[in-house]
UniProtKB/Swiss-Prot annotation:
<dbReference type="InterPro" id="IPR015424">
    <property type="entry name" value="PyrdxlP-dep_Trfase"/>
</dbReference>
<comment type="function">
    <text>Catalyzes the transamination of p-hydroxybenzoylformate to L-p-hydroxyphenylglycine as part of the biosynthesis of the (S)-3,5-dihydroxyphenylglycine constituent of the glycopeptide antibiotic chloroeremomycin, a member of the vancomycin group of antibiotics.</text>
</comment>
<feature type="modified residue" description="N6-(pyridoxal phosphate)lysine">
    <location>
        <position position="266"/>
    </location>
</feature>
<keyword id="KW-0032">Aminotransferase</keyword>
<dbReference type="GO" id="GO:0030170">
    <property type="term" value="F:pyridoxal phosphate binding"/>
</dbReference>
<dbReference type="InterPro" id="IPR050859">
    <property type="entry name" value="Class-I_PLP-dep_aminotransf"/>
</dbReference>
<dbReference type="GO" id="GO:0008483">
    <property type="term" value="F:transaminase activity"/>
</dbReference>
<dbReference type="GO" id="GO:1901605">
    <property type="term" value="P:alpha-amino acid metabolic process"/>
</dbReference>
<keyword id="KW-0045">Antibiotic biosynthesis</keyword>
<comment type="pathway">
    <text>Antibiotic biosynthesis; vancomycin biosynthesis.</text>
</comment>
<dbReference type="GO" id="GO:0033072">
    <property type="term" value="P:vancomycin biosynthetic process"/>
</dbReference>
<dbReference type="InterPro" id="IPR015422">
    <property type="entry name" value="PyrdxlP-dep_Trfase_small"/>
</dbReference>
<dbReference type="Pfam" id="PF00155">
    <property type="entry name" value="Aminotran_1_2"/>
</dbReference>
<keyword id="KW-0808">Transferase</keyword>
<keyword id="KW-0663">Pyridoxal phosphate</keyword>
<dbReference type="InterPro" id="IPR015421">
    <property type="entry name" value="PyrdxlP-dep_Trfase_major"/>
</dbReference>
<dbReference type="InterPro" id="IPR004839">
    <property type="entry name" value="Aminotransferase_I/II_large"/>
</dbReference>
């Protein structure tokens, strides 16, 4: 056990060890992304099909100024604010719930057919803060557990670890989270004296699998939630990026079971770090759930940067509150990249019956299945000897499953890099298939 000894200003020693720090720091989910970053730094010429970052070609610093100017004009002309108030809005601390909740509500009505009152919106520092606030609020005592599909987004797993919230897995299928297994897990929790507070779900092009739920499955999931009195935490980061649009759970919800988590990282600007949560549920004696989330946010980040909010607001204002309109070029590129990735997988690996992959109709991710172990050792070998990076799927299972799958991200690369990246991946897989079986 390594112990670090520090001397404080009084000459007293302070001993620190991992055993005396929060247990989440040694969990594989917390450290999984560090490995990818280390490999990217160590092998800079390797083509990364690991990072789920948005396309960069259209980034332009001038847009930041245009967006802020548009928001300031909105404050002056639409809201009739004096110049001193406009200046204060950007430079001072802002309200905890955010300064653009009304504009987000208009965007939700325009793009998602969601009727959200501004007071039910809390603007957060990315969707990650929204997840933390929700789980911290719902985790009241040792009985409380969260359900989530297996595999699931590591950010959700991380938020659960930081809030000491146990996560119970729900089976996933090619049609997304399985509502019938959700029923079984609810029954199991009841038998064990546990209280399921919510089920996390990404109905559209889930990270990491790329799968989506069809319309009947969405209705069934809402039925299960209503019948059992649980919340559904709907994460819709990739909903715009498909060949067809299905209604969000929130737009279908008639019983108040859906808490909607949104992010502008993929549709607005990742560097702004602006997300939000729509929590319009009533809390007995406490107003809206959004009000309770706001209390915690006030002690965590105080408020989301008003300047960052102004950037996002300007983009909404200049695109008639439609991120579908604002992302028309990006949507086309992601569709192109996805179809190219699938066709390249077929070209390079289609003759190998033991290798397969799913065929999402949108989003950023494709899942490849192979008949051998995909672990961090193989990832390092791929970077070093084949010049390609991917994400081993076991990271999204907490290291407990998924050892024969990998995730490819199609969002950031050019067509040329996709072709070369898949070619390198195919060379790795073909070579690995020749290794002697254990």
């Amino acid at each position: 056990m390594e112990i670090l000894v520090f001397m404080d200003s009084y000459g007293l020693s302070t001993q620190l060890s991992m055993e005396t720090l929060h247990g989440s720091l040694t969990d594989p989910a917390i450290s999984s992304m560090n490995l990818l970053n280390e490999l990217i730094d160590e092998y800079p010429v390797a083509i990364s099909m690991a990072a789920g970052r948005p396309y960069e070609e259209f980034f332009d610093v001038r847009l930041i100024h245009e967006y802020i100017d548009a928001y300031c004009d909105h404050l002056r002309h639409d809201r009739k604010l004096a110049e001193a108030v406009v200046t204060r809005t950007l430079f001072q601390y802002g309200t905890t719930k955010g300064i653009i909740a009304d504009l987000i509500a208009r965007n939700l009505a325009e793009d998602e057919n969601i009727d959200a009152a501004a007071e039910s919106v809390v603007v957060t520092v990315g969707a990650q803060e929204a997840m933390f606030l929700i789980l911290r609020t719902l985790r009241a005592d040792e009985r409380d557990v969260l359900l989530a599909p297996a595999p699931t987004y590591v950010g959700l797993t991380g938020a659960a670890l930081l809030t000491d919230t146990p996560v119970w897995p729900v089976q996933s299928t090619a049609n997304g989270v399985d509502p019938e297994d959700l029923v079984l897990q609810l029954k199991r929790a009841d038998e064990q004296g546990k209280r399921v507070r919510a089920c996390y779900v990404t109905p559209n092009f889930a990270n990491p699998t790329g799968t989506s739920m069809d319309l009947p499955a969405r209705h069934r999931l809402l039925e299960v939630a209503e019948a059992n009195g649980i919340l559904l935490l709907e994460d819709n980061a990739y909903g715009l990026f498909g060949s067809e649009r299905l209604p969000s759970l929130k737009s279908l919800d008639r019983s108040g079971n859906v808490v909607y988590i949104g992010s502008f990282a993929k549709t607005g600007m990742p560097g702004a770090r602006v997300g939000y949560v729509v929590a319009d549920q009533r809390v007995a004696g406490g107003g809206l759930l959004a009000d309770q989330l706001s209390k915690l946010k006030g002690m965590l980040t105080v408020n989301t940067s008003p300047i960052a909010q102004a950037v996002i607001a300007g983009k909404l204002l200049l695109n008639d509150f439609s991120l579908t309109k604002a992302n028309a070029r990006e949507i086309a590129i992601y569709q192109r990249n996805l179809q190219l990735t699938l066709s390249e997988l077929e070209r390079t690996l289609g003759g190998l019956p033991e290798v397969g992959w799913n065929t999402p109709t949108g989003g950023f991710f494709v899942t490849v299945t192979v008949p051998f172990v995909v672990d961090d050792e193989l990832l390092a070998h791929a970077a070093r000897d084949h010049g390609v990076l991917f994400t081993p799927m076991h990271h999204f299972y907490g290291g407990k499953d998924g050892f024969n799958q990998l995730r490819l991200s199609i969002s950031l690369l050019t067509p040329e890099l996709i072709k070369e990246g898949v070619t390198r991946l195919a060379a790795l897989i073909t070579a690995r298939l020749r290794w002697p079986r254990a």
